Design a protein with these regions (language model features):
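N-terminal secretory signal peptides that target proteins for export/translocation
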Residues: 1-16
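N-terminal leader/targeting pre-sequences
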Residues: 39-231
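Sec/Tat signal peptide C-region and signal peptidase I cleavage site
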Residues: 34-38
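Bacterial N-terminal signal peptides
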Residues: 20-31
Length: 231
């Protein structure tokens, strides 16, 4: 092989290397972009409201994307009772008290809700509570399946579907500075299961049980289970 040929080969190698680097960089950027837009998923236990112990065999799955959130809840409850799913959303969880978002960020006294709402913390955490878009009647075995969803900036339409939010959105508790979901990837989402009592035979009353806060209680409504999803 002549020196001219060897020099020619030496000159061409950097060009191939640069092309390879460009392709590799493009691949890395594409992968990073796809990872950034990919949905985040997590699965947590469902806890009993009274005992704070896990409900046997129950779970809640949350999927986050830039567009909003979707949830799947599988649990056991009282057979024949109507239930609705609610989201308690902390859009600024870094401002939650004691480093964890909970009742003390909503109520003045978590052990006595009649003491009133903690308006400063609701504002600081940019908290909101809305219907999760799901309701169902537990089957004869007590099994309950709920699949909810909420988009960014979405305000649930219908009576009794917005609990904590802005006064302009006609929230039942008009103390919020925001309504619904602002940051689906960064918010703390607490799914709450409300029991409305025995399912009504009247379709209109049943619809209220499945879609509105404390709707058509038969005879009472109570929060029985919850699941905490931390980003």
């Amino acid at each position: 092989m002549t020196m001219r040929a060897q020099l020619g080969q030496i000159k061409r190698r950097p060009m191939r290397t640069r092309a390879g680097v460009v392709i590799l960089a493009a691949t890395v950027l594409l992968a990073a972009s796809q990872a950034a837009s990919a949905a985040q998923k997590d699965r947590v236990r469902v806890l009993d409201q009274a005992s704070r112990e896990p409900v046997r065999g129950a779970f809640s799955m949350l999927e986050r994307s830039d567009r909003g959130i979707e949830t799947r809840l599988r649990t056991r409850a009282r057979p024949g009772h109507a239930h609705s799913l609610w989201y308690v959303i902390f859009n600024s969880p870094e401002n939650c008290s004691d480093g964890a978002c909970g009742d003390d960020d909503i109520f003045i006294d978590p052990s006595d809700h009649s003491a009133g709402f903690n308006a400063p913390q609701i504002a600081a955490t940019r908290a909101s509570s809305v219907w999760g878009g799901a309701g169902a009647v537990a089957n004869p075995a007590g099994r309950l399946k709920l699949e909810g969803a909420l988009g960014v900036g979405e305000v649930p339409d219908g009576p009794g579907r917005l609990v904590i939010g802005r006064a302009a959105d006609r929230a039942l508790v008009p103390l919020g500075v925001v309504t619904g979901l602002e940051d689906p990837r960064g918010a703390v989402i607490i799914g709450v299961l409300q029991d409305h009592g025995a399912a009504h035979a009247d379709p209109e009353l049943l619809e209220r049980q499945l879609t509105s806060f404390q709707g058509a209680c038969n005879p009472v409504c109570e929060e029985i289970q919850f699941a905490v999803h931390v980003p």
